């Protein structure tokens, strides 16, 4: 995403000793009981909490609508630095973000932050975005879609504002793209900036019992995010109005490929934005699973290809942790992904 990355990393001091070549949260944590505070598994750096997302069955996050339909959400993550010398992706798997707010809507949060020119911006966003979204008024009692979207927009704005202040004082120059998911009750919100992507696997029909009918049939892959690159007309227009130049290589000022990101303070004056696109949908029996991935994953997997790969493994009865690991392994070892590669697989089950 950023050419001449070495020019931008001279003043940063990332701690990469925790970034293994290949990683899943299953490798790090064991089953835990429900914590008194929000349980988080976060990766790509020194702040790795020793709690997991495989709780006892009665403690797993589920979401109940007014019709009392209940969905179990299982998720896990895997990462690999690929051919890169350092790992600049970080991630969050927060299966129950509502434990700090008793009596509120059940909430889950998942995110991938893909750093470029370093990992400081990605780490900052991981630590602050979710809290800023909550502080901005993410609904906790009665779901209001407009209010939720407004809170997400404000959370992104506030996070980037604070990051830019920090980057000036700390001499940071790096940036990070993001793909984030919040699940409130049965409503799913997906927000992204840059080229990280979320793909939904949906069945074409359900039978009269409400069960999936995709057995033997491919699921439909639905891309829930929109890529933000400087070469795309809508993004190019904003950049040019801000005085930015798209070079012949398709990059802003000849260097930055993405047009929306956290950080990148030297490019903000040229129209780089941290305003996300937000997509919302309702969980029904047709939604099977989601795949969140950084651009490294999608460079070697098409959306339908990735959905088919995951569907096959899930039909074999493999746990979501194994599925996420195999997806990343396939991308890096078999398909020769050269970039950092991180994927979160989120499975929806009706119980």
Curated annotation (Swiss-Prot):
<feature type="binding site">
    <location>
        <position position="114"/>
    </location>
    <ligand>
        <name>Mn(2+) 1</name>
    </ligand>
</feature>
<dbReference type="InterPro" id="IPR036457">
    <property type="entry name" value="PPM-type-like_dom_sf"/>
</dbReference>
<feature type="domain" description="PPM-type phosphatase">
    <location>
        <begin position="74"/>
        <end position="348"/>
    </location>
</feature>
<feature type="binding site">
    <location>
        <position position="339"/>
    </location>
    <ligand>
        <name>Mn(2+) 2</name>
    </ligand>
</feature>
<keyword id="KW-0378">Hydrolase</keyword>
<keyword id="KW-0464">Manganese</keyword>
<dbReference type="Pfam" id="PF00481">
    <property type="entry name" value="PP2C"/>
</dbReference>
<dbReference type="InterPro" id="IPR001932">
    <property type="entry name" value="PPM-type_phosphatase-like_dom"/>
</dbReference>
<comment type="similarity">
    <text>Belongs to the PP2C family.</text>
</comment>
<keyword id="KW-0904">Protein phosphatase</keyword>
<feature type="binding site">
    <location>
        <position position="115"/>
    </location>
    <ligand>
        <name>Mn(2+) 1</name>
    </ligand>
</feature>
<feature type="binding site">
    <location>
        <position position="295"/>
    </location>
    <ligand>
        <name>Mn(2+) 2</name>
    </ligand>
</feature>
<keyword id="KW-0479">Metal-binding</keyword>
<dbReference type="InterPro" id="IPR015655">
    <property type="entry name" value="PP2C"/>
</dbReference>
<keyword id="KW-0460">Magnesium</keyword>
<feature type="binding site">
    <location>
        <position position="114"/>
    </location>
    <ligand>
        <name>Mn(2+) 2</name>
    </ligand>
</feature>
<feature type="region of interest" description="Disordered">
    <location>
        <begin position="1"/>
        <end position="63"/>
    </location>
</feature>
<protein>
    <recommendedName>
        <fullName>Probable protein phosphatase 2C 8</fullName>
        <ecNumber>3.1.3.16</ecNumber>
    </recommendedName>
</protein>
<dbReference type="GO" id="GO:0004722">
    <property type="term" value="F:protein serine/threonine phosphatase activity"/>
</dbReference>
<feature type="compositionally biased region" description="Basic and acidic residues">
    <location>
        <begin position="54"/>
        <end position="63"/>
    </location>
</feature>
<dbReference type="GO" id="GO:0046872">
    <property type="term" value="F:metal ion binding"/>
</dbReference>
């Amino acid at each position: 995403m950023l050419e001449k990355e070495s020019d931008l990393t001279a003043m940063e001091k990332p701690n990469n000793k925790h970034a293994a070549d290949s990683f899943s949260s299953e490798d790090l944590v064991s089953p835990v009981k429900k914590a008194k505070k929000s349980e988080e598994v976060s990766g790509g750096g020194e702040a790795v909490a020793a709690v997991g997302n495989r709780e006892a069955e009665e403690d797993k996050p589920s979401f109940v609508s007014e019709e009392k339909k209940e969905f179990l959400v299982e998720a896990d993550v895997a990462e690999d630095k690929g051919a890169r010398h350092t790992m600049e992706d970080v991630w969050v798997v927060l299966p129950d973000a509502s434990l700090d707010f008793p009596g509120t809507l059940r909430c889950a949060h998942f995110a991938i932050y893909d750093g470029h020119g370093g990992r400081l911006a990605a780490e900052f966003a991981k630590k602050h975005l979710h809290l800023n979204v909550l502080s901005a008024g993410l609904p906790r009692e009665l779901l209001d879609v407009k209010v939720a979207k407004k809170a997400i927009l404000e959370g992104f704005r506030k996070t980037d504002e604070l990051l830019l202040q920090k980057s000036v004082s700390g001499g940071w120059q790096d940036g990070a793209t993001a793909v984030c998911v919040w699940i409130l009750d049965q409503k799913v919100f997906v927000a992204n900036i840059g080229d990280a992507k979320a793909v939904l696997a949906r069945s074409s029909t359900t039978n009269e019992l409400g069960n999936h009918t995709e057995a033997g049939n491919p699921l439909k892959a639905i891309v829930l995010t929109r890529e933000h690159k400087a070469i795309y007309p809508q993004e190019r227009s904003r950049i040019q109005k801000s005085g930015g130049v798209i070079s012949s290589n398709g990059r802003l000022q000849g260097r930055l490929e993405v047009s929306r990101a956290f950080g990148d303070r030297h490019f903000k004056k040229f129209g780089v934005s941290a305003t996300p696109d937000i997509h919302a949908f309702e969980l029904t029996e047709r939604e099977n699973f989601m795949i969140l991935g950084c651009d490294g994953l999608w460079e070697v997997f098409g959306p339908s290809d990735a959905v088919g790969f995951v569907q096959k493994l899930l039909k074999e009865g493999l746990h979501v942790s194994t599925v996420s690991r195999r997806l990343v392994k396939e991308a890096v070892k078999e398909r020769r992904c050269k970039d950092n590669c991180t994927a979160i697989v989120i499975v929806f089950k009706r119980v």
